[in-house]
């Protein structure tokens, strides 16, 4: 895929900014850096923009320049609202972005964990993952969370991971760098958070069931909050 468009969503007044070491692991996506400011009840966008607009714009420009310095074309924008999930969805749909990055504290991009729920759009997801520079990559591991009430959950998960790994190999990822793990649990967010320990990036895929807050809200946000691991959501 030529230059996929990645939405980088940061929140003001204290945005989490991707580190230079982390950005070195990306291979030529286009970045749309969007700063979101949460408006309190009765607070107007005009008042906040008048008071802090220049400061926030300067910060966003500096973040975009950090991407540019690593060879990533970047644009930036500042939005205001009371619902960051709704604002994010609106931008995603308006600009038809290919992926969403929620920045965290990782200083490198050597170990990537991919949550794999099913094999839907596997080839597209694999091609999107090609934005990760393989020269920097040490491991790209796969995890599936099986339903404990499903007697065939684990075996089904193993099949999903095997097929996903095969697709990654087909697009050029080294087979020796791919590990597969099936976890069992009813709390998917918790299981993925536990699995994300020690990784530099957590990758989630959007599925039909996951549209809206399930992925663009609580699960991705939960993992980021618990582990401070950047989350990349593939569409």
Task: Cite the ranges covered by each PLM segment.
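N-terminal positively charged helical leader segments and presequences
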Residues: 40-58, 64-69
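Short beta->alpha junction loops
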Residues: 77-82, 179-186
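Charged helix-capping and loop-helix junction motifs
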Residues: 53, 158-162, 216-220
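Small/aliphatic-rich secondary-structure junction motif
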Residues: 1-47, 111-155, 166-174, 178, ...
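Gly/Ser-rich helix-loop-strand patches that form or flank binding pockets
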Residues: 81-133, 196-235
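Short, ordered loop/turn segments at secondary-structure junctions
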Residues: 37-41, 79-81, 104-106, 144-148, ...
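Helix-enriched interaction subdomains in cytosolic or periplasmic regions
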Residues: 1-5, 58-103
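A short, acidic, amphipathic alpha-helical segment used as a generic capping/interface helix at domain edges
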Residues: 164-167, 184-196
